[in-house]
């Protein structure tokens, strides 16, 4: 049976250039990731550790933000655009963090599957970790929610050219999972 799959894959490669057409592919060249967190923990001070791509590993980048009692990690893998800018906004019990790409990057290649993994971890764990995912596990949000009331994650895949910027696709992930409201 595996030899039949191998021959079928070779046939698809000769026609399409790869073994399968990717139903989730978007030709984006910029990322915009927004994280809204509601928490009772201290939001200042914080430190940001931004690991831009390096010549030894151009497939993965991550940003880690440390607060007193929790930390947030955003990791991208096989994404053409990298997170090169981070903006942090705080008020009372709300934390808004924007991770995005401002520099010019190549368009996402169809033969590379970009994944974005966002984790929010509390220093003192009192609950089990929960994970939500979208688009065949490409985009994920996970947290133990021990020190957070809720977490909302928005991911925008953006295409730019000399005259226009277009959001090709947006994804929303929430913890705890809850139903969206319906507006008439």
From Swiss-Prot:
InterPro entries from the UniProt entry: Poxvirus_TNF-rcpt-II_C, Vaccinia_virus_B7/C8
Pfam families: CrmD_SECRET
Chain ranges passing through the membrane: none
Highest taxon, organism lineage: Viruses
Signal peptide as annotated in the record: 1-21
Keywords assigned: Early protein, Signal
Family assignment from sequence similarity: Belongs to the poxviridae C8 protein family.
Protein name per its UniProtKB record: Protein C8
Source organism per UniProt: Vaccinia virus (strain Copenhagen)
Lineage per the UniProt record: Viruses, Varidnaviria, Bamfordvirae, Nucleocytoviricota, Pokkesviricetes
């Amino acid at each position: 049976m595996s030899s039949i799959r191998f021959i079928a894959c070779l046939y698809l490669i000769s026609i399409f250039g790869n073994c399968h057409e990717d139903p989730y592919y978007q030709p984006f060249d910029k990322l915009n990731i927004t994280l809204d967190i509601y928490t009772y923990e201290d939001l200042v001070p914080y430190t940001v550790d931004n690991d831009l791509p390096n010549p030894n590993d151009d497939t993965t980048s991550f940003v880690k933000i440390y607060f007193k009692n929790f930390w947030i990690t955003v990791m991208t893998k096989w994404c053409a655009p990298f997170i090169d800018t981070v903006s942090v906004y705080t008020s009372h019990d709300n934390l808004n963090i924007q991770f995005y790409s401002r520099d010019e990057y190549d368009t996402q290649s169809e033969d590379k599957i970009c994944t974005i993994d966002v984790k929010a971890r509390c220093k003192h764990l009192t609950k089990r970790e929960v994970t939500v995912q979208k688009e065949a596990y490409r985009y994920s949000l996970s947290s133990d929610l021990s020190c957070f009331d809720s977490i909302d994650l928005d991911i925008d895949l953006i295409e730019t050219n000399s005259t226009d910027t277009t959001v090709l696709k947006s994804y929303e992930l929430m913890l705890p999972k809850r139903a969206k409201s319906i507006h008439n």
